[in-house]
Amino acid sequence: MDILEQIIATKRRELAGMMAPKRSLKKALADSPTGIIAEFKRKSPSKGWIHADVRPEEVVPAYAAAGAAALSILTDEPYFGGCLEFIRRVRPLVDIPILRKDFIIDPVQLYQAAEAGADAVLLIAACLSREDCAALTAEAHRLGLEVLLEIHDAAELDYIRPEVDVVGVNNRHLGSFVTDVQTSFDLIDGIRRRITAPLRASALRRAEPKLVFRQTCPKNNFGPPAGEATGPIIISESGIGEPETVRALREAGFRGFLMGEHFMKNPDPGAALADFIQAI
């Protein structure tokens, strides 16, 4: 093999991660008994360093072994002490979905996420216009990435579109970084209305067959095919630290819970997650 052939072979290997089938965050949350997205976060703007010296190779596999449904990895460096390389380093170590958590404002960041081995990306409504959010969602899907759309208040409810895979309520105010889990309870009904309206419209369109079809098929054949997705999964993010909070959120209709700081401030984040799961 000459040098050019070696270079081409290397490039093919580099592209393999981007082209490989992705794991579904939405399905993982729907199927999980815990619904916990465990986050690797070393630092935050409000708390400073939470766990400065820890390596993702130590924490992420322990999260997976403890029963996490999926993983969230901060890749912002200045404010959260993360980097994209963290995803590359842990991707071969776990089989559950990885969310790239960052402030994504440009398609280039989607290409980075896909190349690094992420399965899903975070899109923050507060960072994007509605048009840009829709365009980034479409491009993410073209790359095989799922989208977690994050909202913070009722004004952002109209960012929710049927094609979004997961809708998350961030209980942390991005201006003050103060957390209040009540935000999730306040928004859940509005989210449900936004999700179910297009589903109802779609079902009505399906139930408008031609007359001859109506005469030859039983009524109970109308509607979505078996196994078809029924809209985005709803999750709650930030400020969750007690098992009772998870139980209350689950009762309200949330299927997933993104948690990081509660585990990362522990000397053994994986063990902290295992204990938390036992308690819920």
Name these PLM-found stretches:
Residues 1-98, 105-108, 139-163, 174-184, ...:
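Conserved N-terminal beta1-alpha1 strand-loop-helix module at the mouth
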Residues 128-144, 152, 169:
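Solvent-exposed, charged amphipathic helical/linker segments at domain boundaries
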Residues 189-192, 196, 222, 278:
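Residues marking helix boundaries in flexible regions
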Residues 74, 100-101, 123-124, 170, ...:
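Thr-Gly-centered strand-to-loop micro-motif
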Residues 112-132, 169-177, 254-273:
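Glycine-rich phosphate-binding active-site loops on the catalytic face of alpha/beta enzymes
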Residues 196-230:
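Short, low-complexity intrinsically disordered segments enriched in small and basic residues
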Residues 165-167:
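Active-site regions of enzymes building and remodeling cell-envelope glycoconjugates
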